[in-house]
């Protein structure tokens, strides 16, 4: 079965297709969702900052209209990306997640970071170009590790002050320059909870467009140490039995997948599938 959504660099000069409109308030939606006939959308009174061709959905070309600000459109409203992640069609969420990352990049790279002059959009490549500096800027992707640390029937979960009240999750952190994903994992676990790990195994990955992370998921076994929480980063961290877990992250997140996968294997239950 072919994928409903595939990314591609499309020339905005071509006509027709579908389009999504994104503002600082989220994506424009109506009763049918966030994908609109492009010609209709461009006839609306929208404050367009730029337009990018981003791919194909069900065989139709898709474009992003990145807006300077939200505009009232009759019969429509604005909806944040996280709401699409939590519910509705996951293929549509993938379109919007990609669009959000391209929109963030386009908004933040209008001017050259070296000389300050306006950059131009390259039509055949996903890049912005500064001619005086001969410099190309590509969409930013931030590699991050996320790990479930286990000890038999116990899993190590923590909560950040930024989490929804009561929710516990796996440990995670951004990779530093010159650092492998495994080195990042060991360092982040040590920094956040002062625990050592062993037998690191890669599990899977997930795009996390909030705003531009690539989450690399791992499982690791406890090797030693007592939990000492990192100030300002970790509000609480505990070992939880797979039989008695606290409130967990959203079901479509890789954090939840890592937890559900381990619990299923310990309890002999059907294994979950990571949304991609």
From Swiss-Prot:
A motif (Nudix box) lies at residues 173-194. This is NAD-capped RNA hydrolase NudC. A divalent metal cation 2 binds at residue 188. GO terms for molecular function: magnesium ion binding; manganese ion binding; NAD+ diphosphatase activity; NADH pyrophosphatase activity; RNA NAD-cap (NMN-forming) hydrolase activity; zinc ion binding. A divalent metal cation 1 binds at residues 172, 192, 233. SUPFAM superfamilies: Nudix (SSF55811). Homodimer. One of its GO terms (biological process) is NADH metabolic process. Residues 139-262 form the Nudix hydrolase domain. Belongs to the Nudix hydrolase family. NudC subfamily. A divalent metal cation 3 binds at residues 188, 192, 233. Substrate binds at residues 82, 125, 138, 206-213, 255. mRNA decapping enzyme that specifically removes the nicotinamide adenine dinucleotide (NAD) cap from a subset of mRNAs by hydrolyzing the diphosphate linkage to produce nicotinamide mononucleotide (NMN) and 5' monophosphate mRNA. The NAD-cap is present at the 5'-end of some mRNAs and stabilizes RNA against 5'-processing. Has preference for mRNAs with a 5'-end purine. Catalyzes the hydrolysis of a broad range of dinucleotide pyrophosphates. It comes from Pseudomonas putida (strain GB-1). Zn(2+) binds at residues 112, 115, 130, 133. The keyword Magnesium applies. GO terms for cellular component: cytosol. InterPro entries: NAD-cap_RNA_hydrolase_NudC, NADH_PPase-like_N, NudC-like_C, NUDIX_hydrolase-like_dom_sf, NUDIX_hydrolase_dom, RNA_Hydrolase_NudC, Znr_NADH_PPase.
């Amino acid at each position: 079965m072919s994928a409903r959504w595939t990314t591609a660099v499309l020339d905005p000069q071509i006509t027709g297709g579908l389009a999504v409109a994104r503002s600082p308030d989220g994506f424009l939606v109506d009763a049918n969702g966030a994908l609109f006939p492009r010609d209709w959308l461009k006839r609306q009174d929208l404050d367009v900052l730029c337009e990018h061709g981003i791919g194909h959905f069900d065989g139709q070309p898709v474009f992003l209209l990145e807006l300077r600000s939200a505009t009232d459109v009759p019969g429509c409203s604005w909806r944040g990306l996280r709401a699409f992640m939590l519910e509705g069609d996951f293929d549509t969420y993938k379109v919007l997640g990609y669009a959000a990352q391209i929109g963030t990049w386009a908004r933040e790279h209008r001017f050259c970071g070296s000389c300050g002059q306006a950059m131009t959009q390259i039509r055949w490549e996903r890049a912005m170009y500064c001619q005086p500096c001969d410099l190309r800027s590509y969409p930013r992707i931030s590699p991050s590790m996320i790990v479930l640390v286990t000890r038999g029937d116990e899993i190590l979960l923590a909560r950040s002050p930024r989490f929804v009240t009561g929710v516990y999750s796996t440990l995670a952190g951004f990779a530093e320059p010159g650092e492998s994903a495994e080195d990042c994992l060991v360092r982040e676990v040590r920094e956040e909870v002062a625990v050592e790990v062993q037998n690191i195994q890669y599990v899977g990955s997930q795009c996390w467009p909030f705003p531009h992370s690539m989450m690399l998921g791992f499982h690791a076994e406890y090797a030693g140490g007592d939990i000492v929480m990192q100030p300002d980063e970790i509000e609480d961290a505990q070992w939880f039995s797979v039989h008695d877990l606290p409130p967990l992250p959203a079901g479509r997140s890789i954090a939840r997948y890592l937890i559900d996968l381990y619990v299923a294997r310990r309890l002999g239950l059907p294994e979950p599938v990571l949304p991609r």
